[in-house]
From Swiss-Prot:
Membrane topology term: Lipid-anchor; GPI-anchor
Protein's name in the database: Cell wall protein PRY3
Residues carrying lipid (GPI-anchor amidated glycine): G853
Gene3D superfamilies per the UniProt record, alphabetical: CAP (3.40.33.10)
Gene: PRY3
Source organism per UniProt: Saccharomyces cerevisiae (strain ATCC 204508 / S288c) (Baker's yeast)
Length: 881
């Protein structure tokens, strides 16, 4: 459905007497519109909008009176006219109804003004005008909101005239000495079907034919009610006496229909019929030779049915019908001799059909037999009036869209019988009414006047049965479509499609129909998250997205060739993402990256044709299913690629001052590769990112030194006599690096009274498990010793197990693992005078050399903060000296 209104045509220019002003312009134009809208079914009156009127008047004021009409192309619907009065323009627009074809509703250049005037959804109007002199007279502009003339909505928005939905009846009567009056009454409310509707009722004595074709055959039938009554009577005369009998009978059937719209997503209804009969008879005679019998019966019946269906949008419809029938007085004056008998037989049959979406049938039959003999007493009996009502209503919940196609335009719209539903429910109700009425005896006394009244009360029995069924089918087959015909008498087609949960059935009888069903199901899931232990952390995430859609199109027309196409498209996409960050930098192998893409397409087509003497039907079924599976795996590994580092400690003595210098260095880069690979049609793309070794807290060097004056003579302590202890605490930072970051450092020697100078002592090593070089330089008047301590891989990179003695491991939401040491743990037993804090948050290495073997409290060396590290360093130096 297009979401823009089609511009309506321009008004025609006619010559009328000029009128320059319209004092009651607003009310006249509004009333003229509403007068015409009131002629159509369910079309509400318009209201005046000052906003629309201002818009229309502004556009009218801009007109150049050139005689050329051009639309404003604004947001509203619009009608233009030139040369008319205010109401004359509306009359001219509505006059296009004579050219509108309700059998083929749609937009036409010759009816665009009319359809905008009566467009059911339009609620507001505003108009303006401009006088263009004696040549063109008045220029009229009317704006409508919401606008009309939308493609695909004409059948629903342009309602037929109320007069076309009417009830018609005809009757005739005749009287003779040998035949009673026979009358036929037919009343119907016709459905709007494409082929029209014809009702013919006939009897022996009279006949009547009723034919009604609605003006809008495209609208779906909402109510069908028809009734026919045939009364026959015969009289037989025996003997030579003369019998005169006159009787009259009339049956009046009236129908009252009403419809209402109920918004409901799923509703079922049952039909109930109630009936009551009151019967009385009386006889009053003052004449011994005459008698009068009067019988009256009333049988009001009411029936209501409500059906609702739920589609992609909620639609519900309910209708109710009230049916009442009555038989008026039957009288027969009798005069006869004792040798003459008169018998009459009457049969009354009434048939009423109500249709609301589905079939509701009410059948009522009554048969009355009476015989009268000319004697001192006569009797009239009417027994066993029985009626039964059975009704069946089904409702379904479905998701579907109907599309009508016809190559020959034989039938643009059709009646659809059947339903397509994911789940369906039905309600069946039946009721039976049994009546026994009118059992009266009339006594006539020839000698005296006798009045006798006798009546029998009616009996009514109602039975009701209701059953509700629900069904649901789940299959994984592709859609199939088939169609068949039988000698142009009936058309039937069955369409089933199922991807996930759906079943559909469409059938028709003698009509053309078309339907389209589209079902889409989506499923997504996220699965499998695991974290392996020991030296690495792995996270696996799998996301699966499955999309499947089924489209079924079935079309059958009255043309000689019918094309039915079924398409089944199913797409499935699965995406798997694997992230495997490895904590061990010595493991230089990246996790494998798996990529896969699989696309499979399969389909089948078949063509079948059947030929008979009346019609040829060709059925073509095409089924295709496409499945696409795309899997992408991304693996990430975090480690440091062969970092080399060294830590050296130098002790220099000069002028009775001892300078202790510790230097941390990092001589090579540490790589952080991240590989992301994907494959499309067996072509892989890989990107690797390398990151260099980080600096120490953002600085290029880091040096810790302390110069003190000893209490004794200068002494150079050999480096080999220094015992050493290495303690490493590992933590995960935001980048998940696990290596120890150090940098080359040039020591600064501070001598009292002298200018500080840079020391040239530093040590490097290419690999963590190789000994670092030792360099020693002697300055003038000074002696120095540099000792480099080797740290092994096992000490530097060991990840404490969560089961180690005294260890405490905490895992946060970011997936990082932090290991800390509790008090009393054997992992921390430092005795040192020098302490170096490396890159905070990554690793902490304490290089401790004991001069005097003094122990330091354990709580200082918990590697928890920089403050604790500095305190440890100061305490260690004080103990050393």
């Amino acid at each position: 459905m297009l979401e823009f209104p089609i511009s309506v045509l321009l008004g025609c220019l006619v010559a009328v007497k000029a009128q320059t002003t319209f004092p009651n312009f607003e009310s006249d134009v509004l009333n003229e519109h509403n007068k015409f809208r009131a002629l159509h079914v369910d079309t509400a009156p318009l209201t005046w909008s000052d906003t629309l009127a201002t818009y229309a008047q502004n556009y009218a004021d801009q007109y150049d009176c050139s005689g050329v009409l051009t639309h404003s192309d604004g947001p509203y619907g619009e009608n233009l006219a030139l040369g008319y009065t205010d109401t004359g323009a509306v009359d001219a627009w509505y006059g296009e109804i004579s050219k509108y074809n309700y059998s083929n509703p749609g937009f036409s250049e010759s009816t665009g003004h009319f359809t905008q005037v009566v467009w059911k959804s339009t609620a507001e109007i505003g108009c303006g005008y401009k006088y263009c002199g004696t040549t063109w007279n008045n220029y009229i502009v009317c704006s409508y909101n919401p606008p009309g003339n939308y493609l695909g909505e004409f059948a629903e928005e342009v309602e037929p005239l109320i007069s076309t939905v009417s009830s018609s009846s005809s009757s005739s009567s005749s009287t003779s000495t040998t035949s009673d009056t026979v009358s036929t009454i037919s009343s119907s409310i016709m459905p709007a079907v494409a082929q029209g509707y014809t009702t013919t009722v006939s009897s022996a004595a009279s006949s009547s034919s009723l034919k009604s074709t609605t003006i809008n055959p495209a609208k779906t039938a909402t109510l069908t009610a028809s009734s026919s009554t045939v009364i026959t009577s015969s009289t037989e005369s025996v003997g030579s006496s003369t019998v005169s009998s006159a009787s009259s009978s009339s049956v009046t059937t009236s129908y009252a229909t009403s419809s209402s719209t109920v918004v409901s997503s799923d509703a079922t209804s049952s039909t109930t019929t109630t009936s009551s009969v009151a019967t009385s008879s009386s006889t009053t005679s003052s004449d011994p030779t005459s008698s009068t019998a009067a019988a009256s019966s009333s049988d009001p019946a009411s029936s209501s049915a409500a059906a609702s269906s739920s589609a992609s949008t909620e639609n519900a419809a309910s209708s109710s019908s009230a049916i009442s029938s009555s038989s008026s007085m039957v009288s027969a004056p009798l005069s006869s001799t004792l040798t003459t008998s008169t018998a009459s037989s009457r049969s009354v049959t009434s048939n009423s059909v109500n249709s609301v979406k589905f079939a509701n049938t009410t059948v009522f039959s009554a048969q009355t037999t009476s015989s009268v003999s000319a004697s001192l007493s006569s009797s009239v009996a009417a027994d066993d009036i029985q009626g039964s009502t059975s009704k069946e209503a089904t409702s379904s919940v479905s998701e579907h869209t109907s599309i009508v196609t016809s190559a020959t335009n034989a039938a643009q719209y059709a009646t659809r019988l059947g339903s397509s539903s994911r789940s369906s429910s039905g309600a069946v109700s039946s009721s039976a009414v049994s009546q026994s009425v009118l059992n009266s005896v009339i006594a006539v006394n020839t000698d005296v006047s006798v009045t006798s009244v006798s009546s029998t009360a009616h009996t009514t029995k109602d039975t009701a049965t209701t059953s509700v069924t629900a069904s649901e089918s789940i299959t994984s087959e592709t859609a199939q479509a088939s169609s068949s015909t039988e000698k142009n008498i009936s058309n039937s087609a069955a369409t089933s499609s199922s991807i996930y949960s759906n079943s559909a059935s469409v059938s028709g009888h003698g009509v053309t129909y078309a339907a389209e069903y589209a079902i889409t199901s989506e499923q997504s899931s996220a699965l499998a998250t695991s974290v392996p232990a020991t030296n690495c952390s792995s996270i696996v995430k799998t996301t699966t997205l499955e999309n499947s859609s089924t489209t079924t199109i079935t079309a059958i027309t009255k043309s000689t060739t019918t094309l039915a196409t079924t398409a089944n498209n199913s797409t499935r996409a699965a995406t798997a993402v694997t992230i495997d960050p490895t904590l061990d930098p010595t493991d230089n192998s990246a996790s494998p990256t798996d990529n896969a893409k699989h696309t499979s397409t399969y389909g089948s087509s078949s063509t079948g044709a059947s030929l008979d003497s009346l019609r040829t039907t060709t059925s073509i079924s095409v089924s295709s299913n496409t499945t696409q599976l795309v899997s992408t795996c991304t693996s990430e590994s975090d480690y440091s690629d062969s970092p080399s580092f060294a830590i050296s400690t130098a002790t220099t003595t000069e002028s009775n001052l001892i300078t202790n210098t510790i230097t941390a260095s990092c001589s090579t880069d540490s790589n952080f590769p991240t590989s992301a690979a994907s494959s499309t049609d067996e072509t892989a793309f890989t990107r690797t990112i390398s990151t260099s070794c980080s600096t120490l807290n953002g600085a290029s060097t880091q040096t810790s030194e302390l110069t003190t004056s000893p209490m004794k003579t200068n002494t150079v302590v050999p480096a080999s006599s220094f015992p050493s202890t290495t303690t490493t605490c590992l933590e995960n930072d935001d980048t998940a690096f696990s290596s120890i970051y150090t940098e080359v450092n040039a020591a600064t020697i501070i001598n009292p009274g002298e200018t500080s100078s840079l020391a040239s002592d530093f040590a490097t090593s290419e690999k963590p498990n190789e000994p670092t070089s030792v360099k020693s330089t002697s300055n003038e008047g000074t002696s120095s010793t540099t000792t480099t301590y080797q740290q092994t891989v096992a000490t530097l990179y060991a990840k404490p197990s969560s089961t180690s003695l005294g260890a405490r491991t905490t895992t946060g939401s970011n997936g990082r693992s932090t290991t800390s040491q509790q008090d009393g743990s054997a992992m921390h037993q430092p005795t040192s005078s020098i302490y170096t804090q490396l890159k905070e948050g990554t690793s902490t290495t304490a290089k401790l050399s004991a001069y005097e073997g003094a122990a330091t409290p354990l709580s200082i060396f918990q590697c928890n903060s920089l403050a604790g590290t500095i305190a440890a360093f100061v305490v260690a130096v004080l103990f050393a000296f």
